Amino acid sequence: MYTTGLIGKNINYSESPEIHNNYYKKNNIPFFYKIFNLKQDQIDDFIKNLHKNNIKGFNVTIPYKETILQYLNDIVYPADKIGAVNTVAVQEDKLIGYNTDYIGFIKSLQYYNIQVKNFKCLIIGSGGSAKCIYYALKELNARDICIVSRNPEKARLKFEEKVKILNIKDENKLDRYDLIVNCTPIGGPNFKEQKPIELKEIKKNCVVYDLNYTPKRSKLLKEAKENGAFIINGEKMLIFQAYSAIGLWCLNGIKGGR
C-alpha cells in the first residue's frame, strides 16, 4: 500500500480523502490518501521523508501552492506558466509538479455547460488559485479578465503586465461581469461568516463561482442566488482535479515511477 495525500494548513475539513479513497477502493488501486496539516517550517522534513514514508504523490492546497515550487525538479505545463502547483508526482529521483486545478476548473465549466468565450470575468484574489483560474479563462477565450486583490501592488508582481488589477475596495461596478470567481478562502470553512466582496448589483444571469465547497453555499453564493445569479461551488472542480491527479500518479508508475 502506497501513501498519497494533501498538504496544507488548517485543512481537516477537506473532502479529498473521501474522494480519493473511494476511487482507490472501487478501482483496486493500492493507494491510501490522508491529510498532512503542515506548518511552513515542517515542509522541509515532509519532502525529505517522502520515500521513507512510501509517499508516491501528493496534492497541495492553501497556502503552499507557490511555496512548493522550490522543491520540484520539473514543472509541467501549464503549472510552469501559472506559477502554482497543486499536484506532485514522486518519482525515484525527482519531484514533478502539475496543476490539475486548471483541468478541474475547465471540466467543471463543461459539466455545467458554461461557455465563457467573450465573457467579462472578475477574479477575486491573487494567490495560486487565482493565477490558475486566470490562465484557464484566458485559454477559454474570455473577452476580458479583471482581478481584484487586497494588495494590488503585490498582485501585479504575479501576473502578466497587461492584466487589469484593482484594489478589492475600489471595484463596485459588478454589473459589467458575466462571471465572478472567488479564489480566496473567505467564505470557506475557516471564514464561514465572511464574504470576499459585496454583490450589490450583478447581471441577472451572471455566473458566480466560489472555489470553496464547504459550506455548500457560502454567504457569497447565497447573496448571489438572491440576486438571480447561477451559482457554483468548488465541489465538481475538486472531484475532477482529484481524478486527474490520480491518473498522473498511476501514469508515473505505482512502483515508484520511471
Swiss-Prot record:
GO terms for biological process: amino acid biosynthetic process; aromatic amino acid family biosynthetic process; chorismate biosynthetic process; shikimate metabolic process. It holds the Pfam family Shikimate_dh_N. NADP(+) binds at residues 125-129, 211, 234. Shikimate binds at residues 14-16, 61, 86, 101, 213. CDD domains: NAD_bind_Shikimate_DH. It catalyses: shikimate + NADP(+) = 3-dehydroshikimate + NADPH + H(+). GO terms for molecular function: NADP binding; shikimate 3-dehydrogenase (NADP+) activity. Its EC number is 1.1.1.25. The active site is at residue 65. It comes from the Bacteria. Keywords: Amino-acid biosynthesis, Aromatic amino acid biosynthesis, NADP, Oxidoreductase. GO terms for cellular component: cytosol. It is an enzyme of class 1 (oxidoreductase). SUPFAM superfamilies: Aminoacid dehydrogenase-like, N-terminal domain (SSF53223), NAD(P)-binding Rossmann-fold domains (SSF51735). Pathway: Metabolic intermediate biosynthesis; chorismate biosynthesis; chorismate from D-erythrose 4-phosphate and phosphoenolpyruvate: step 4/7. Homodimer. Involved in the biosynthesis of the chorismate, which leads to the biosynthesis of aromatic amino acids. Catalyzes the reversible NADPH linked reduction of 3-dehydroshikimate (DHSA) to yield shikimate (SA). Belongs to the shikimate dehydrogenase family. NCBIfam families: aroE. This is Shikimate dehydrogenase (NADP(+)). The gene is aroE.
